[in-house]
Amino acid sequence: MGSGYQLLQLPRERFRKTSFLVWVIILFQRAISMPLGIVTNSTLKATEIDQLVCRDKLSSTSQLKSVGLNLEGNGIATDVPSATKRWGFRSGVPPKVVSYEAGEWAENCYNLEIKKSDGSECLPLPPDGVRGFPRCRYVHKVQGTGPCPGDLAFHKNGAFFLYDRLASTVIYRGTTFTEGVVAFLILSEPKKHFWKATPAHEPVNTTDDSTSYYMTLTLSYEMSNFGGKESNTLFKVDNHTYVQLDRPHTPQFLVQLNETLRRNNRLSNSTGRLTWTLDPKIEPDVGEWAFWETKKTFPNNFMEKTCISKFYQPTPTTPQIRARRELSKEKLATTHPPTTPSWFQRIPLQWFQCSLQDGQRKCRPKV
């Protein structure tokens, strides 16, 4: 019994040496890990991912998930006059295209068809396989002319134009896109013992009920001097009725504007063009700038719709003279369109500063 006990017990000196060796191996492995040589079919280098995850967080490319994140959550202005100022033409820069696996709903998308003064196209056709962004609440369809001083239209802030699971640095003609960036999320490796138990298969009822999806609404515009310093944007109600847009506004404002013009018979009644102008005291930011982020709180969120009839102040005109009409000072009623939760949860990302200290790589959030 005693001798058996002695066989299981290491001498104190040998125990110290053995435990010291084990700790050295553990620390050596963590501090000087081999570069991750697992990235093959990717433009990222192994060393870049190695630095990104601080050496010990990524064990397989299956843990990397590329997602497209929209810029709307940053609070940028999404109306057409403001958005087009973020885009510009350049020559001699090759376009870049990268794929992403998942995205999120977009409140505002854009679709451009711009021609030069000589009738030639400003924007290239999309390459094979590039389709429009599939999840848009509002599609702002812009047709017009401009100088287009360059071969391709890029984002001035370096963002991507997100299409259907493809992100490009340039705008393609007649193809719906939204502004965004592509990020790589690192998913933790699942423990193997999670899969030991037989998974329970629950019956799933799938449906193609369209009410569970967003209704996409297309808003049309005419723009002149696209790409120039001073551009002019008109909201198109019908082929002969337009509204001059001279300041930022929400898409909900334009929807109500369109409904009010039609309901109150304010459309052009001849073949001439009728252009309305907004009263300076009208607030064009009714509703929400983006469906997850309310920009402004209004005291009368659910105003009676009967007051909309007073929204316009008719101006006597003759059929021969097409004069601009000015909207009155009444506010539009604020209504909120039905929204659904985003199908991909927005995940806040943070930059980390990594450094090598005492043989170990340490990462801290950037301030």
Curated annotation (Swiss-Prot):
An annotated GO cellular component: host cell membrane
Keywords: Cleavage on pair of basic residues, Disulfide bond, Glycoprotein, Ion channel, Ion transport, Secreted, Signal, Transport, Viral ion channel
Coiled coil feature spans: none
Record-marked site positions (Cleavage): 325-326
One term of GO molecular function: channel activity
Pfam families, per the entry: Filo_glycop
Keyword Ubl conjugation: no
Protein family membership: Belongs to the filoviruses glycoprotein family.
Name listed for the protein in its UniProt record: Pre-small/secreted glycoprotein
Organism: Reston ebolavirus (strain Siena/Philippine-92)
